[in-house]
Curated annotation (Swiss-Prot):
GO terms for biological process: purine nucleotide metabolic process. One of its GO terms (molecular function) is metal ion binding. Homotetramer. This is GMP reductase. It holds the Pfam family IMPDH. The keyword Metal-binding applies. It comes from Klebsiella pneumoniae subsp. pneumoniae (strain ATCC 700721 / MGH 78578). Keywords: Metal-binding, NADP, Oxidoreductase, Potassium.
Length: 347
């Protein structure tokens, strides 16, 4: 046993210090970035925000809606190969360049992903997603995926520390997904006692990944556009959003009615709801590590997307960053005890 004495920080623990700026307008800020990935060699440009690969967020409808903003969608892994084929045949090339295929690490997952990629060679991103990216089996699967799909950009996660980030990149991942327990419907930290405050995880993993020519995704912990800006300021190349994009027309959640008001169900992918829906229930040897919530219907996602991008542009103007790429270089975090004036929050 050992104790690390260094304080680790989440997004709620800091604010970004404003700095002198020459920008006249938020419209002067360029949010698009261009990346050339380490192993695949592919180049991608767009807004580096990703809708999470949850079945109540990462849907085909969400992908079509967010692609108009240049935003990526990690489509959840529960679509069949036939559904994928129907989607790609009806979607434009501009939509498909912003789509990721998600997979688990079972033999069945591998075979289905192989089929999807064979039928739809225009898809360039594969997101290998497990709750615990520290297992030897996971690292071996990433290496297997790299060998099988050498020209695809591979995302692997989730982890929260630099040494594991490096191992995944050296095993074939182009991008590492960072975050254990910060999600809005994730209960891993309270069920297991395991986790890492998200901002510190991003800072540590970004340093490790960039040293090897890889990239990272900050996955989880964002509750408002300011948190997205903090994640980018901390060194994240991409930011993945779940709860902030849930409850919309494109989210695909079940709609329920209570007292004449309609709500959409949103749940973590390790929740009892998800496991009951996809694998017939919670296995006897495990506990559910997610919860189910009812969200008021929020209308089309385009309004939320504009709000997020507007907040991000504004953050850049406050520190003089004319491009999103410059935000991390211009970010100084200050530790705080308060984030906002909450006097009217209950109204």
């Amino acid at each position: 046993m050992r104790i690390e004495e260094d304080l680790k920080l989440g997004f709620k623990d800091v604010l970004i210090r404003p700095k002198r700026s020459t920008l006249k307008s938020r419209s002067d800020v360029e949010l698009e970035r261009e990346f050339t990935f380490k192993h695949s060699g592919l180049t991608w440009s767009g807004v580096p925000i990703i809708a999470a690969n949850m079945d109540t967020v990462g849907t085909f409808s969400m992908a079509k809606a967010l692609a108009t903003f240049g935003i990526l969608t990690a489509v959840h892994k529960h679509y069949t190969a036939e559904e994928w084929l129907a989607f790609t045949q009806g979607a434009s090339a501009d939509v498909l360049k912003h789509v990721m295929v998600s997979t688990g690490t079972s033999d069945a997952d591998f075979e289905k992903t192989q089929q999807i990629l064979s039928q739809n060679p225009q898809l360039n991103f594969v997101c290998i997603d497990v709750a615990n990216g520290y297992s030897e089996h996971f690292v071996q699967f990433v290496a297997k995926a790299r060998e099988a799909w050498p020209q695809k950009t591979i995302i692997a996660g989730n982890v929260v520390t630099g040494e594991m980030c490096e191992e995944l990149i050296l095993s074939g991942a182009d991008i590492v997904k960072v975050g254990i327990g910060p999600g809005s419907v994730c209960t891993t930290r309270v069920k297991t006692g395991v986790g890492y405050p998200q901002l510190s995880a991003v800072i540590e993993c970004a340093d490790a990944a960039h040293g090897l020519g890889g990239q990272i995704i900050s996955d989880g912990g964002c509750t408002m556009p300011g948190d997205v800006a903090k994640a980018f300021g901390g060194g994240a190349d991409f930011v993945m959003l779940g709860g902030m994009l849930a409850g919309h027309e494109e989210s695909g959640g079940t709609i329920v009615e209570e007292n004449g008001e309609k709500f959409m169900l949103f749940y973590g992918m390790s929740s009892e709801s998800a496991m009951t829906r996809h694998v017939g229930g919670v296995a006897k040897y495990r506990a559910a590590e997610g919860k189910t919530v009812k969200l008021p219907l929020r209308g089309p996602v385009e309004n939320t997307a504009r709000d997020i991008l507007g907040g991000l542009r504004s953050a850049c103007t406050y520190v003089g960053a004319s491009r999103l790429k410059e935000l991390t270089k211009r970010t100084t975090f200050i530790r705080v005890q308060e984030q906002e004036n909450r006097v009217f929050n209950s109204l």
